[in-house]
Amino acid sequence: MTFTRRAALGVVAAAPVVLRRALAQPDAIPIGALYPLSGALALLGDESFRGLELAVEDRNAAGGLLGRPVRLAKGDAFDPNQAVGEVRRLMDAEHVAAVFGTYAGPLVFAASQVTELAGTPYFELGAIADPVTERGFKYLFRSCPVASAFGLLTVDAVNDALAPLWGVDPKSLKLAILHEDALYGVTVSGFQAARCRDLGLNVVENLSYGAATVDMSSVVQRLRSAGADVVLHTGYQNDVLLFFRQMRQMGWKPRMIVGAGGGHSLQDTASAVGADCEGMLNADFTQFAVNEAAAPGAHDVQAAYEKRYGTKPRSGHSLANYAGARLFLDVIQRAGSLDKDKLRAAVLATDLPSGATAAGWGAKFDEKGQNTRAKPMLMQWQGGSQVTVLPEAAAVSKLRPTFGA
C-alpha cells in the first residue's frame, strides 16, 4: 500500500480535530476492583466483579461520576498476600481514587489495612465477616450484611420454620455446625453456636476443616455417628462439592443442610451436585428469584446481566455487588468530591429505607462504616434453582420439608 501525500495531508488535517476531542474529554476516574479472579475463589470473585462492572457501566451511561467517566482497574487477589500486593499496585501504578471489592473476608482484612494507612476509601460489597468493620477504620465502608446476621438466620430458620414444618420440637433435633476454618467460617459458626445456646438447641458436633482439604470422610463419619438431623454448613464451592460427594460415597445425609452463602449459592454447585442438593436451604444475599416488591429492580439487573454476559447469573453475588456499588457511586456523586473526609461524611449521611436498592436493602451506616439496613434472606434449592422462601414479603415459593434426591 502506498502512503500518498494526499493521505498524509488528510492525517495532518485531522490531527487538530482528534486533539481537540481528546482535550475535550475529561480524564476517567480510576476505581480499583479487587477480587479473587484466579484460584479456588475465582468463580465467586468473578461473579461479584460482574455486579460492580454493571454498576459502573450504568453510571457511565448516565453521564459518569462527577462529570467524568469511571475506569475500572482490576486486581487479582487470590490470597491475602496477593491482595496486599495488588492493592498497592492499584494505588501506586493505577492511582485509583477508591477500591471496591472484595468478596472474601481474609482478602479485604489484609488489603484494607494498606488503604486505611494511605487514606484511600475502601468500599466492601461482599465480605461478611463482622471483624472487617470492627477495627476502628475511618475510610472502610461495607454495604452488605454481616456474618452475625447469617448465623442468626440459619439457626432461626431451623427453630422457627423448619421444625414446625416437620411437626417436631426444635429442641429435639440434633444440630451440627460445620465450617471452613478461615475468617468467614469461623465468624459465622461462632454466631451460630451462640444462637443455638440462646435458644436451648442441641448441638451435637461443631467441626472445622481447612478450605483446601481434599478429604472430608472423617467429617461425614462423625456427623453420621452423632446422628445429626441438621447440618449448618459454612463453606466455599470446592469444599461444598467435596462434602456432597463424600456424603454420597458413604451413603449418608442429614435430614437437612442449611448453608450460609458461599458455595451453597452457586448455580454451578447445584449443577455439579444434581438432585442431591434439592431442598437444601441457604441463608445468603438476595438472589434473583425474589419478589420484586421487596427488591425493586432485581429483575432489571438480571436482564442487563444476561444481555452483557450472554448467560444467566451464577448467584446473587452479582446482584449484591451491583446494589452496593450503585449505592457507593451515588454517595461519591452526592459528596461532589473524591476527598476522603467528604466521602466519609456523605456515607454517614446516607439514609435509605429498606427496599430502596435492587437487593432489597436500605442504607444507614454506623460509625464503623457498616450498613445496618442490609439483611440476608433464606433461599431453598427447588427444581434446580435457588428461590427465596423467607421473609414472606420477598418469597416466591413456600418452604419445602424435604432434602435430597
Predicted regions located by residue number:
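N-terminal export signals
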Residues: 2-24
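C-terminal segment of N-terminal export signals and the immediately downstream linker at the start
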Residues: 19-35
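Extracytoplasmic "Venus flytrap"
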Residues: 32-53, 75-81, 103-104, 178-187, ...
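Short, polar/charged alpha-helical segment
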Residues: 42-65, 190-195
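Beta-alpha junction/loop-to-helix N-cap segments that form part of ligand/metal-binding clefts
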Residues: 43-48, 63-137, 143, 209-216, ...
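Extracytoplasmic ligand/sensor domains, especially the bilobed periplasmic-binding protein
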Residues: 96-204, 255-282
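Extracellular/periplasmic periplasmic-binding protein-like sensory domains
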Residues: 247-322, 392-404
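Segments of small-molecule ligand-sensing domains
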Residues: 305-318, 329-388
